[in-house]
């Protein structure tokens, strides 16, 4: 009769016996499931405990690392031993605040090519709008630079009024007449003073424009500059020896115009350059008398308003 393996090995046999006794005992009392459940709970407790410990260790290490980094950072900070150290820190702060600004690259527009013929109306409009290719096309096709509209205004007049200095130079080089007068007998210099471009004014004077040219009202370019309030134009004309005492059709000098229009900066400028304040206009008034006349007129207006309000207040009482 063959023996089983367990029976031949005494230790194994005893183990099996104990296990069978334990299982039998537990099963016998109906507590096997409870024992297994307790065993699992103990295992879970062990596992949870080990995870918590690992997490705590991790947090401790992170705190230590942060502490070391902070300590290192503090050690690397510049020390304030003197004023030079303070200035160094301020300079470093300023550098940090400076931000790089990316400037967008703008492509230059390609030159406009004009194929069709340019008529007179388009030519005048191009002078106003500073469309150089249109002007060049018109001139290249043999167009007359001195052509004018029904008011005898030329392209040069228009370009001067808008301050298109490059176009003015182009038109003059093409043969435009600087002294050409429109219906009101204004020259290019008059139109420039209306527009207020000092650069265009300088160009015209350098090209030989008459500085004291007269229009239909006998006004000079200086009269126009004072009336329109273009200080720099007036100053440049005076510096180029424009006539300070030129009289228009009403006998007014630029100073008379400045007083009448309350151009205080112009008045100071003219006085600075030695204008004669005793010149009388056609009405027999000096600039100073115009000031007094204006003041008296203002007083009369205010006095009239005061008396009117006084009467109204008394009437309202009854």
Curated annotation (Swiss-Prot):
Subcellular localization: Nucleus
Main location: nucleus
UniProt GO cellular component terms: cytoplasm; nucleus
ANK repeat copies, ranges: 118-147, 151-180, 184-213, 217-246, 250-279, 283-314
PROSITE patterns: ANK_REP_REGION (PS50297), ANK_REPEAT (PS50088)
A Pfam short name: Ank
Coiled coil: 37-77
Keywords: ANK repeat, Coiled coil, Nucleus, Repeat
InterPro entries cross-referenced by the UniProt entry: Ankyrin_rpt (IPR002110), Ankyrin_rpt-contain_sf (IPR036770)
Cited function: May act as a nuclear transcription factor that negatively regulates the expression of cardiac genes.
Name of the protein this chain belongs to: Ankyrin repeat domain-containing protein 1
Annotated organism of origin: Xenopus tropicalis
Gene name linked to the record: ankrd1
């Amino acid at each position: 009769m063959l023996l089983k393996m367990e029976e031949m090995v005494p230790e194994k046999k005893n183990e099996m016996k104990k296990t069978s006794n334990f299982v039998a005992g537990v099963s016998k009392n109906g507590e096997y499931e409870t024992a297994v459940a307790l065993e699992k709970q103990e295992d879970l407790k062990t596992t949870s405990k080990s995870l918590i410990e690992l997490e705590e260790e991790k947090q401790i290490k992170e705190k230590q690392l942060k502490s070391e980094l902070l300590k290192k950072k503090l050690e690397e900070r510049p020390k304030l031993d003197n004023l030079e150290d303070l200035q160094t820190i301020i300079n470093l702060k300023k550098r940090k605040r400076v931000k790089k600004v990316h400037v967008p690259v703008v492509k230059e527009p390609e030159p406009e090519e004009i194929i069709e013929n340019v008529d007179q109306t388009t030519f005048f409009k191009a002078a106003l709008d500073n469309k150089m290719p249109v002007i060049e096309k018109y001139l290249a096709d043999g167009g007359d630079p001195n052509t004018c509209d029904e008011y005898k205004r030329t392209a040069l007049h228009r370009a001067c009024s808008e301050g298109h200095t490059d176009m003015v130079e182009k038109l003059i080089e093409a043969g435009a007449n600087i002294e050409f007068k429109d219906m009101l007998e204004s020259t290019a210099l008059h139109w420039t003073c209306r527009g207020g471009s000092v650069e265009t004014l300088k160009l015209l004077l350098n090209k030989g424009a008459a500085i004291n040219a007269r229009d239909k009202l006998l006004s000079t370019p200086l009269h126009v500059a004072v009336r329109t309030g273009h200080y720099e134009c007036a100053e440049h004309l005076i510096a180029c020896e424009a006539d300070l005492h030129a009289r228009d059709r009403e006998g007014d000098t630029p100073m008379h115009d400045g007083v009448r229009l309350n151009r205080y900066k112009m008045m100071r400028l003219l006085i600075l350059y030695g204008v004669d304040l005793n010149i009388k206009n056609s009405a027999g008034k000096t600039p100073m008398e115009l000031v007094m006349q204006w003041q008296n007129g203002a007083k009369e207006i205010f006095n009239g308003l005061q008396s009117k309000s006084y009467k109204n207040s008394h009437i309202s009482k009854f």
